[in-house]
């Protein structure tokens, strides 16, 4: 078996529920060596509690956790599930995300992958403080919308994808204008990804004997109620799980090196003059195969 991939997760967990699914997927994946989780984007104390509670449920309080830079809106969608969780009880809580990213990368004997599934404030702050981190790390990024291939019905044609649109300046400072090697997972492959009812029910069943999955499902149901989600059996879109999958394997995904540039409307374009070269996932061979993998992984079958 290959040595596990050293990983940092930078996440806006606690807003959309797919970040929680992504964290659970990481924690269930022996191919990944999660060393640090950093929170970004909105109500940082609340978001950091969401991450801490899931890490604790998985028995992984050895993973370092660092709050990042916040902003608006609050988007406290699973606050009911978080309850009165005491963040000070988390044993590996660090002071701030940018310094934690720098320290983790610079003190690693191996190149680290930073999986970015939220806005890019923490990356921008870390890179501007210590550009040398790009030499010992690479980025896997959920962001962008290249050909709108999987997004019909979800987004207007050529719209700006949320992780870029929520802070375009952070995208430019943390991604486009850096020396980082970037692997991009746009909406072309992450859009419209969800588990149909039989798969979701299987995950629910697994939660009866797995504390992490039990808490994931409980928080998901709170999210449904808070967001007035018209629940009819399947999950909501699980965009960020595609980023985790790409950190585990490239099988089933088709990549192409492309120069990517986000314009002032946050629309991601293929632009040979202004774009940064990125390895971009554009299509699936078989999306159903991914659904089977995700379900089996969360259920502890593989």
Question: What are these regions, as identified by a protein language model?
Answer:
Residues 1-302:
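N-terminal acidic, glycine/proline-rich low-complexity segments
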